[in-house]
């Protein structure tokens, strides 16, 4: 088997990105971190991650704009995306799923739940 999966974490909260880097690293994932939407799109091209954990409310480009661009990309359109956000409104959840998010998790969240959802997506299983 090749190298461990690379996960792009796009969130503007440094403590959260550190937590996710630690938890994902402990499970054998490699991580790449972006703190705004523009950086997330650049890291997507550089790192070619196998999945993206994406905050909805970030500076420069918000998570929905990043998701739109991922789904419009010939290269990355099939990359699994989990939205991880404090926005819990029905319109937010439905809007993200309609744009192509594979999963949606509301903060505060259980890190173990995120890990299970991520593993299922990487294995090609939908919840």
Spans of features found by a protein language model:
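Charged docking surfaces used in two-component/phosphorelay signaling
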Residues: 18-26
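C-terminal output helix
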Residues: 109-119
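The feature encodes the CheY-like receiver
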Residues: 17, 58-60, 77, 89, ...
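Alpha4 helix (beta4-alpha4-beta5 surface) of REC/receiver domains from two-component response regulators
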Residues: 65, 88-103, 116
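The short loop immediately C-terminal to the conserved phospho-acceptor aspartate in CheY-like receiver
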Residues: 56-57, 82-83, 87
């Amino acid at each position: 088997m090749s190298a461990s999966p690379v996960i792009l974490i796009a969130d503007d909260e440094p403590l959260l990105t550190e937590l996710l880097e630690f938890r994902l690293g402990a499970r054998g994932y490699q991580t790449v971190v972006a703190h705004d939407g523009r950086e997330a799109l650049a890291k997507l091209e550089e790192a070619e991650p196998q999945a993206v954990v994406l905050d909805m409310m970030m500076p420069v480009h918000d998570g929905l704009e990043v998701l739109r661009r991922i789904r419009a990309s010939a290269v990355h359109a099939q990359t699994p995306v989990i939205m991880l956000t404090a926005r819990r409104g029905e319109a937010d959840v439905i809007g993200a799923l309609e744009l192509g998010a594979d999963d949606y998790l509301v903060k505060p969240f259980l890190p173990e739940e995120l890990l299970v959802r991520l593993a299922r997506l990487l294995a090609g299983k939908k919840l």
